[in-house]
Amino acid sequence: MRFLILFLALSLGEIDAAPPVQSRIVGGFNCEKNSQPWHVAVFRYNKYICGGVLLNPNWVLTAAHCYGNQYNVWLGKNKLFQHESSAQHRLVSKSFPHPDYNMSLMNDHTPHPEDDYSNDLMLLRLSKPADITDAVKPIDLPTEEPKLGSTCLASGWGSITPTKWQIPNDLQCGFIKPLPNENCAKAYIHKVTDVMLCAGEMGGGKDTCAGDSGGPLICDGVLQGITSWGSIPCAKPNAPAIYTKLIKFTSWIKDTMAKNP
């Protein structure tokens, strides 16, 4: 499970690490400037850890396996390591990981077939609302299931090489396809459930990877998933990645935001 594993390694080192899962864009390209205005860079202290998605001026959605403390976020960034006048910095006042995510999987351990990374999402409440500009815009939650055959765009600042941690300066984009969950179930020892979305290229070469966790998967212009986990190395043939299937969580997301204005 590449995304989580790499995340753990990052967390324990200069960024922080998680379980056998990880995420980044391999085989992608530099996103057009301000083309992903909902994309958020999530930091712990001054270390980049994950991507995120701006749902409204007060709330960011990311992955539960990015859980920690002392979060802060950057919005409106195209280049992670450069000053940009379009960028906005915000502190996070409170985090809300999904209550059914198994946090014990955050501990490094030997993978088991019963490991279940379902419910991998977390809401971050910003301490100050984001200013909506051309570079910073929210994206709506989905209202229907993603369709097989649609075109999906993943974005992130995750590693751009499959086996070595190489984080890019430019936000990366990559086109992939939603696939039947059976394709992912055949590829992994861990459980693949109906609240997960399988996506990628069966031939390999394009994939999210370590550092992309929590970032958006947008299919035919609709936010359908956030990057959760996959294989190491990334972009292997017959090993597409897993995304949290957001249509399954719209009620929890809306209820959590409404109860914490």
UniProtKB/Swiss-Prot annotation:
> What are the GO BP annotations of this UniProt entry?
proteolysis
Which UniProt keywords are given for this protein, alphabetically ordered? Disulfide bond, Glycoprotein, Hydrolase, Protease, Serine protease, Signal, Zymogen
- Active-site residues? H65, D120, S213
EC number assigned by the record: 3.4.21.35
Which Gene Ontology molecular-function terms are recorded? peptidase activity; serine-type endopeptidase activity
Record's function text: Glandular kallikreins cleave Met-Lys and Arg-Ser bonds in kininogen to release Lys-bradykinin. Displays trypsin-like substrate specificity and shows activity towards casein, gelatin, fibronectin and IGFBP3.
The protein depicted here goes by the name Kallikrein 1-related peptidase b21
Organism in which the protein naturally occurs: Mus musculus
